[in-house]
Amino acid sequence: IRESFDTSIGTIEDVEAFLHVPVLGVIPREDRKEIAKTIKEVFPESLDPESLELLASISPLFDLKGITAEGYRSLKVNLQFACQDREVKSLAFASAGLGEGKTTTVLNLAITIAQDGRRVLVVDADLRKPTVHSRLGLKREPGLSEILVGNLSWQEVVQTAADLMLGKLGFDQILSAPGADNLNIITCGHLPPNPSEFFNSQRIVDLIAEFEANFDLVIFDCPPILPVADAVLIGPKVDGVVLVYQVGRVGRTPLLRAKTLLENAQAHIVGVVLSNVSAEYSPEYQKHQYYKYSS
């Protein structure tokens, strides 16, 4: 009961002081009206509402000068600095609870890195409530589950720019998107009865090694840490874990517990990303907006 009244951490300094890990990025809250306006400017042909909604959540794909794209470029650079003392080929992104912007962060960071010319693989490791496929307008099956049970190889299930073109995002939208040809996706596949068994097996270790050998960076979109054990099982098997935290949504006690669970499992926590941050928490973004519109 006490936790339900827990005060959330409000500033970057508070987060770093409380968790003792660096804040790698601050992703600003988006103005959906502005994004819709930009989409119509970039793609003047009429788009159906579903395509508009999908594009709005991955605006760095087409709006490289926007404030969201800037936020993800900063995250990319800070990640590189945070990992400069060790080779990082695989990362897991996780959050304490539901709805903290983890999948949005994973997809937009992957897009940003792909725009640099690096081959990126996004793996939907949420075998309970997966969303990567729906967020990109792709089919869910086959995917990771089929690979882990041995029915298919990863080469048979990986989806590429060609699949994105034929999906709900639209042919022209992907064709004109910088870096889309470097973006690779493995969706979750069928939903198994006990996903934790998959992530506690040698097969996932071998599979991660295969991914690392074939891509510049592999990013796992994991389920939230506190409800299920999956992210804690994956964490030690990849090169680093990034926590995604939405200011004001989750209290500091659950956030600290999530970090502690990862540390107890010997996972290497690279840092934390603050998602959906309003200007009141990050006044520097107000300044950024001023310069953006006055330039």
What does each of the following model-derived ranges do?
Residues A213-F215, P227-G248:
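Inter-motif core of Ras-like GTPase G domains
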Residues L79, L166-V228:
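Phosphate-binding/switch loop-helix module in NTP-utilizing enzymes
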Residues I1-R119, L127-S145, Q155, D163-L164, ...:
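Short boundary/hinge segments that flank catalytic cores
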Residues K89, N184, D216, D239, ...:
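Conserved acidic residues
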Residues V122, I185, F220, L243, ...:
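Structural beta-sheet core signal
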Residues H20, T103, D124, D221, ...:
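Conserved G/P- and acidic residue-centered "switch" motifs that form tight phosphate/ATP-binding loops
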